[in-house]
Structure formats: structure tokens, C-alpha cells
């Protein structure tokens, strides 16, 4: 998979890909991350990428020309499955979306800033708009990092245990069950005995029941979506 991220501040996006699972995925050649500074696609001496709104109003708007140049250059080199715009207006990121995007070969992610992008960018180039929640950040970079993490960990070979991602919360519209590790007793707090019994069918049944009860208590809305 190749992910091209268009941003005004590429430095924000360097560190997430230089550690842990994402770094290993890149080193294994399972994913390529390419950061594109939008200012490199400007034509003026000031490298301007934003301007005042037509009709007046507070806040600057990202200009269409440098975005067009960047996206068009990338598209001239390869085909892309999606051109994604990170925006609070978008559909909230969920596991279903991450699962779907993880099957893509090439993705472009555009990070918004200021009051957002000229609407013509959204009309002409964007195929999917994604939000990471009903709140506003200074830019789309952190959202892009979250999106990339949620996608990359699903690519076969990225995680050490191939079944690990399949048992994460939300994969079956359920939260994950409680998990425990050694020691089996600590300060009088004991691990449920079923988990140390060695009875795998009973353990699986316990986990399914716990996942359902936990979801019912903490996220009943997920059960309503079934």
C-alpha cells in the first residue's frame, strides 16, 4: 500500500511513522508513506496556500490551485483508490471504514487547515471525507495519523499475530472482552479462573459473553446498529 499525505506542516506527521508498528510496517515494505508539502506546489515567492473568503467572513481558506497541482501530479504517476479529505464535516471514522480502506492499493489524504479548503476541491477531487470526531483541531494532520494507524495495522504481515486485529473492539460491533496477563493474583486481585482452566471452548464462550455485556454497558449504541 502507498499513502500520499498532502499537508501544510509535514513535520507534524514524521514522528508517528518513525516508531513502533508503523515504522516496522514501512521497514518491511508493507506500506509506503509519502509526505507532500503543499507549499512546494505554489508559484509565488511567498508560497501562499490560503486566501480570504469571497463574501467576507472570519478565517482563511486553502486555495484550489496548489492542491490541484499536487493531486494531479500524483494521479499522473499512478491510480488511486481514494482521495480523502480530513475534515470535521466528514463521516466519523469507524472500524468498518478502516477495514475497507486497508484493502486499497493507493490512497491520497488531504489535511485541511484554517477554515478548510475551497469547496471546488471537495467537488472535483475528493472521493471520501473523514472525521475522527465531533471536535475541531488546528489541522487535519493528527486525524490523518489516526486514520493511517487504523488502516496500516490491518494490512497482512503488519502485526505479529495475524488474528490480533480481527479480535479488536468494533470488528463485530462489539467491544473487546477484558484481558489479563501474569501474575494470576496480585494484591488479592485474581484473574477469572476460567482463563487459566485450559478449557478453550469455555474460554471462548466466556469472552463472547463478556464482550456482549461490556458493549451493552458501555456502548449500547453499537448493539442498536446490528
Curated annotation (Swiss-Prot):
UniProt-annotated binding residues for S-adenosyl-L-methionine: 112, 132-137
Keyword Mitochondrion: no
Annotated CDD domains: TrmD-like
GO biological process: tRNA N1-guanine methylation
SUPFAM superfamilies: alpha/beta knot
Enzyme class: transferase
Catalytically driven reaction(s): guanosine(37) in tRNA + S-adenosyl-L-methionine = N(1)-methylguanosine(37) in tRNA + S-adenosyl-L-homocysteine + H(+)
Designated name of the protein: tRNA (guanine-N(1)-)-methyltransferase
Organism: Christiangramia forsetii (strain DSM 17595 / CGMCC 1.15422 / KT0803) (Gramella forsetii)
Amino acid at each position: 500500500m502507498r499513502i500520499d499525505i498532502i499537508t501544510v506542516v509535514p513535520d507534524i506527521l514524521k514522528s508517528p511513522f518513525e516508531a513502533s508498528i508503523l515504522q516496522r510496517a514501512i521497514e518491511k515494505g508493507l506500506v509506503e508513506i509519502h509526505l507532500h508539502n503543499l507549499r512546494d506546489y505554489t508559484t509565488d515567492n511567498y508560497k501562499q496556500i490560503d486566501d480570504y473568503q469571497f463574501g467576507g467572513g472570519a478565517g482563511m481558506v486553502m486555495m484550489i490551485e496548489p492542491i490541484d497541482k499536487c493531486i494531479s501530479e500524483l494521479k499522473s504517476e499512478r491510480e488511486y483508490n481514494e482521495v480523502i479529505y480530513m475534515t470535521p464535516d466528514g463521516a466519523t471514522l469507524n472500524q468498518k471504514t478502516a477495514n475497507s480502506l486497508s484493502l486499497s492499493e493507493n490512497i491520497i489524504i488531504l489535511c485541511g487547515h484554517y477554515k478548510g479548503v475551497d469547496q471546488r476541491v471537495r467537488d472535483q477531487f475528493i472521493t471520501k471525507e473523514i472525521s475522527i470526531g465531533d471536535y475541531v483541531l488546528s489541522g487535519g494532520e493528527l486525524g490523518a495519523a489516526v486514520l493511517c494507524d487504523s488502516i496500516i495495522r490491518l494490512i497482512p504481515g503488519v502485526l505479529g499475530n495475524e488474528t490480533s486485529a480481527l479480535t479488536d473492539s468494533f470488528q463485530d460491533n462489539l467491544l473487546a472482552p477484558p484481558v489479563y496477563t501474569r501474575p494470576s493474583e496480585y494484591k488479592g486481585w485474581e484473574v477469572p479462573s476460567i482463563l487459566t482452566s485450559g478449557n478453550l471452548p469455555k474460554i471462548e464462550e466466556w469472552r463472547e459473553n463478556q464482550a456482549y455485556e461490556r458493549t451493552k454497558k458501555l456502548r449500547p449504541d453499537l448493539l442498536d446498529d446490528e
